[in-house]
Amino acid sequence: IHQPDIVICQDPTNRYGDSNIHHPDHRAAGDTALDAIFPSARDYHMFPELVQDEGLLPHKVLEVYLSTRESNASVWIDITDTIDIKVSALKQHASQVGTDAESLERLETRLKQRASDVGTPHAIKYAEAFKYIRLR
């Protein structure tokens, strides 16, 4: 069982952008991740059977990075060295992005432009924006 110190997830309060409404599944995933981090994972009383029957002890996540709009961000991560890996991974999501060359090219252009737009104000070629939470 992996007990992460750092969790990266969607910001469930990030409901829409200037030209889109964010997918409800992404918001729900962010809410679920945050609920699992606190109080579920760190509270013995939430699932006592996991301690008693499985020997799984409570765990405290130390840091959370919420993927968010730039206006809500407190941290910008330089992804310049890994942007091509990100693009390649997202191109594999064929049911969502298509498989024809034109669609994949538009996806790559859009992803790189968005990362550039996020990074440029911070002197970063390509970046992602996060709301950082340090848990006590």
Predicted regions and their residues:
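Metal-dependent de-N-acetylase/amidase catalytic core
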Residues: 1-136
